Amino acid sequence: MRIAYVCADPGIPVHGTKGASVHIQDVVRELVRRGHDVGIHAVRLGEHPPADLAGVPTWTHPLPAHCADREKAQAQAADAIAERLESDAPDLVWERYSLFSTVLARLARTRGVRGVLEVNAPLI
């Protein structure tokens, strides 16, 4: 299955070392292990992908470093990701929930794409 993993959260570098980054890497790693064709679409990559994920196709839609209207920039990046995926036509979109991103909702509505909205938050 062709799966697009989307992370439009600028606070999470998908190739980083923070907990959310490691979680994304583990999900992608498991999907690949199960034989799926996975591509990562993110606004922030981090510096170096883990060696075992270096072959996973990755597209970045970076946000400006200093932006007066960061929320608008995030929404525009999400639109750019959605536009790319509308032409790529994955079988499934797996989106890590982030504010101002409507990638999965848009593709489900316009293309009928199946999806997973991953909501992952610490319990306090």
Spell out what each predicted region is.
Residues 9-13, 63-66, 122-124:
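A short, flexible beta-alpha/helix-coil linker loop
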